Swiss-Prot record:
Transmembrane segments: none
Subcellular location(s) per record: Cytoplasm; Nucleus, Nucleolus
Main location: cytoplasm
GO cellular component: a single term: cytoplasm
InterPro entries, alphabetized: PDCD2_C
Keywords carried by this UniProt record: Cytoplasm, Nucleus, rRNA processing
Name of the protein in question: Probable 20S rRNA accumulation protein 4
Sequence similarity: Belongs to the TSR4 family.
Length: 396
């Protein structure tokens, strides 16, 4: 009998083609290594990407184009940098993640009042992307269009907290009840659905209620630094053997624990014998390895609002996540701009080290959590802005 495979809610990034002079990335690309391609060429402040330990400039590890479902005008990308100094290989603040956004112009917001203007605006916005083939177009049967995260083309958008096309399939989340952060994000999603009847209301929803920061008046030039070899990533949905869907997880979801809603699996953490058992910690790593084995060349896992795949339960981060299930303090700070909780969004996987040809790195996974409200950072005259997000690192 042939093995049956089941689709999960996670998107995976696989090595596609190397970056070259003939095939260069743009701001809508997702890739490892190389140099970042910022919106409108507006660089961030280089001081942001200095290693917190040695103060040297970090190298780009990943650029991920990550627009959110329901916000067709706001453009968004995540950038991850890492220090290449051997003495910083196990230093927590040697990895930096920045969320970059480009907000719509006032003329674009006004344009959505007219149906004809909407059509024209969408054509104008999509035309630059169509000039060359998107190397990240998903080839699975569930994909539609070039943008795998487009809310209008796919019900399987990983940026939505409810992306399961099969209601009968059990949730892959270890927590059976939603957290405060998940509720907040779901509330926004629900409002977007109910207000999607008019584009004007939709724009008001995504732009109102946000903190207004002083504009950025300085301009910056991205420094010429050494870089890792570049590789485009192709995105596809994750598939796992059907018999693994219901397997019990031992990983934790710090980012979904802002309320005391816990399922039965958390009770085991309260038992001292469980806490001290090395076999439990080993099981966390076994689950990590097993999940990777189904798609061994994955370099990126993306599931905004989902559950991170932990490599260990006994390192500092794993212990902190465990303490949260016992009502301890979360290691994930609130967004400094709007004070909202952060959501898990993505993680870099071990195979990325091989693709980057990074002989220094020793991490097992790099977790990224971002503002659950996706608040607007300070922006410049081109309406481009950057916000530093949370990074959690687990080492070998």
């Amino acid at each position: 009998m042939s093995q049956k495979w089941v689709q999960t809610q996670a998107w995976l990034g696989f090595p596609d083609v190397p970056i070259s002079q003939e095939d260069k990335p743009d701001e809508y690309s997702t890739f490892l290594g190389g140099f970042p391609v910022f919106f409108d060429g507006c660089s961030l402040n280089p001081n942001i990407i200095k290693c917190g330990n040695c103060k040297n400039l970090c190298r780009l590890l990943l650029q991920c184009y990550a627009p959110l479902e329901g916000d067709n005008l706001k453009e968004r990308a995540l950038y991850v940098w890492g220090c290449h100094n051997p003495s910083c290989r196990r230093v927590p603040n040697s990895i930096v993640c920045v969320r970059g956004v480009r907000l719509p112009l006032k003329s674009d917001i006004e344009a959505v009042k007219s149906p004809k203007a909407i059509s024209h605006l969408e054509e104008k916005k999509s035309s630059p992307k169509e000039k060359k083939v998107n190397p990240f177009a998903i080839t699975s049967e569930s994909s539609r269009g070039l943008n795998p995260f487009s809310d209008a083309t796919s019900a399987n958008n990983p940026f939505s907290l409810s992306t399961d096309v099969n209601p009968s399939k059990p949730s892959s989340n270890v927590f059976s009840k939603p957290s405060f952060a998940a509720k907040a994000q779901q509330s926004i999603t629900d409002q977007q659905k109910t207000q999607a009847k008019t584009k004007t209301k939709h724009i008001a929803l995504t732009t109102s209620g946000m903190s207004v920061h002083p504009p950025v008046t300085e301009t910056y030039t991205y420094p010429v630094t050494e870089a890792f070899q570049g590789m485009f990533l192709g995105l596809d949905l994750e598939y796992v053997p059907q018999n693994k869907v219901n397997s019990k997880k031992d990983d934790f979801s710090t980012f979904k624990n802002y309320t005391p809603y816990l399922n039965d699996s958390s009770e085991a953490w309260e038992k001292e014998s469980y806490e001290k058992s090395p076999s439990v910690y080993e099981k966390t790593f076994r689950l990590f390895s097993e999940k990777i084995s189904h798609n061994p060349t994955q370099c990126l896992r993306y599931e905004r609002g989902g559950t991170p795949l932990l490599a260990s339960g006994r390192d500092k981060l794993g212990q902190q996540l465990k303490s949260v299930t016992n009502f301890g303090k979360s290691p994930v700070p609130l967004c400094p701009l709007c004070k909202s909780p952060r959501l898990f969004e993505m993680q870099l996987m071990p195979h990325a080290i091989s693709i980057l040809n990074d002989e220094i790195a020793e991490w097992s996974t790099i977790l990224v959590a971002t503002c659950s409200m996706d608040c607007n950072p300070p922006i410049n005259k081109d309406r481009v802005g950057y916000a530093v997000e949370w990074v959690g690192i687990q080492w070998d």
